[in-house]
Amino acid sequence: TASGKLQRKFLDRFAISMGRGVALGKTYGTLGAASRGATLLQDLLFTEIIFAFDRERVPERAVHARGTGAHGTFLSYEDWSNLTAASFLSAEGKFTPEMTRFSTVSGARGSADTARDVHGFATRFYVDEGNFDIVGNNIPVFFIWDVIIEPTLMALHAQKPNPRFHLPRGQQDPNRISDNLTARGDSLAQGSQISSERGSPKAYSNTEPNKHRSFRLVTDNGKQFQCSNHWQPLQGFIDLGVEEAWRFPEEGEGYVAENLFESIELLTVGDEELEIQSMSFNNDLRERFNSSEVTKSSVVRLVPLITQGKLVFNKNIQMLFNEVIGAMFQPGHIVRGVDFTEDPLLQGRLFSYLDTQLNRHGPNIQQLGFNRPPRAPIHNNNRDGAGEMIDLPPFASFVETQEWGAKDIKQTAVGQNKFDQEHRFSHWKFGVNGFVHTRNDDNVTHARGFFTAPERGQQKKRVAAFDRMFTVVGLSVDGQQANSDQYADFDAAAGKKVAKAIGVEAPKPNSNYFHPTDVFGEHIAASGTKYGVPEGNTKGVLLASVNKPASIAQGAKLQVVASSGDFAEFFISAKQLNMREVTQGIIPLVPVLKLAKLDLGKTFRFQLMQVGNIEELERFGFDLPDLTDKQVDLSAMGMFETTFRPTSRAAQFEQGKTKLVKGLQGKNAFMDRALKQPSNNREKIQRFADRFAVQD
């Protein structure tokens, strides 16, 4: 091969030498006392080689050990200085070099990267001020939301192989992980998503990674926003499929990594767009939706996604050890314009990430090749230690010195030094204690929304995946029953489907939760009754089919529960409307939607939809599509995103880049209105329209 010829050419130019540079010639034997004598201890070449070999392996990562990587470039779509002072987002068209590490979470270094698992996606931006890391996974929620639980769940215990005989090789023991997840209600949302197509992506560049830990963006004038990151693959998400997902761990240990390598070499790799959800710290949504609670995802319709830029992969890694094993990503790597939040998982990981990296590579990990910031000089007070590689000047290793002069570091609220000021946590409203804070004990709503509102055709696929996961991999009968019962908690129909697929007794509906019967859609509740009724300023409608009287009865029950609160004045009695000669029941919860365009068919199913405030509706318009003979999740309609600049409503369409998240074309005015809006992104809107079109 070309690389082999290059290696031989390189070796032919040089004689074998020792680490200190002394050439020894082309000899490959040890020194002996005679032709058949004992090896001599004075053979320092042998000792140097063997000592280095014995120390080649560094401690394996406790999680994310199996990985690969790629280099690329990030392009900022525009100037985002209204949200952050970070320089890589400071100008339209600004390019920033980056590197990304892809991984599985549970498997060992040599395990199959096709195993059903959470998949890591860590990106490092080499920005002007230093290195900025976005560390996340391909699933928007997490198992736990307090870091003290993490070692038991993640590191070496529940998600690892059976400790008795370490099987399955490098993968999870199904009984151990099932036992843990079914005992924890807050793990339900992520557990259900791992069991779906999201647990077995076919290509790393076609996953939908998320930085599920929230963080802060800070502007030059000190304005703060609480944010979360999302990556969106422009080629769409691609999974292995149910059968391949269970066959590949046996046949293709490096399939996903090889797929990434070849796609970059052939220039067919997909790009990823960076999207964020942002809200100010005085936004009342922070009280309704605990954005620091990573077991639940934020509501896109209430906190719209803003597309900030695009990540392009353009170069493969050259050495796995240097660029993947030796690359130290951590959430503590932030730059000016980015800061931390009170997220308990984040706070614990700020300590844990650095601790485990120091354990693996020593105290000078920042001096290793791809950990060094290429655009920013290093002026810290670190000295000596194993692995010291930088020639430091003979300066005093402390700030206050008469010889070199002491600088007056001002504590300012704005400008370059604003991140040093004492009031950086002035938004903190809670006392310090040892109790676990949460504003939302509802652990089933997000799992229900994921399972009952998938893309068309995915629900059967997910049930089939559950069948394989709960039967083929050797899960005990008790474990199968426990999983079936847990799925019944978030949806009675889902529990029955899973139970039937795996051949266990169908669970009874849990009376503590509202169970849809003939509904299809996403239900997200902030915090409320056991029926999942949202509180606060939520607007939405509940639609139920009279073909299923139970759905009308449940809707009425939901309405009664909701109307008993302080906002009962917003609720009106159930109505019957005739649409397309099929009567549907409509129970409005704050009737702000204009139903003039509503055109429903026999198979329309929808549980609860939340939209933004009335101003959002007036600003962007909201027309419903033709859903005749279609099962469509209206939550996929989405809205427009803007840069939310403080300009007039009319100017927002002209200045802010708009983008349609999801839409359905069909015979409706929604897409027509979208395409008529002033926008420099009209081609992208049309592509999305074609992709999500409803076929007659």
From Swiss-Prot:
One of its GO terms (cellular component) is cytosol. Heme binds at residue 353. Residues 189-208 have a biased composition (Polar residues). Residues 187-211 are annotated as: Disordered. Its EC number is 1.11.1.6. SMART domains: Catalase. Keywords: Heme, Hydrogen peroxide, Iron, Metal-binding, Oxidoreductase, Peroxidase. It comes from the Eukaryota. Its cofactor is heme. One of its GO terms (molecular function) is metal ion binding. GO terms for biological process: hydrogen peroxide catabolic process; response to oxidative stress. It catalyses: 2 H2O2 = O2 + 2 H2O. Pfam families: Catalase. The active site is at residues 64, 137. Occurs in almost all aerobically respiring organisms and serves to protect cells from the toxic effects of hydrogen peroxide. PANTHER family: CATALASE, CATALASE B. Belongs to the catalase family. This is Catalase. It comes from Penicillium janthinellum. The lineage of its organism: Eukaryota, Fungi, Dikarya, Ascomycota, Pezizomycotina.
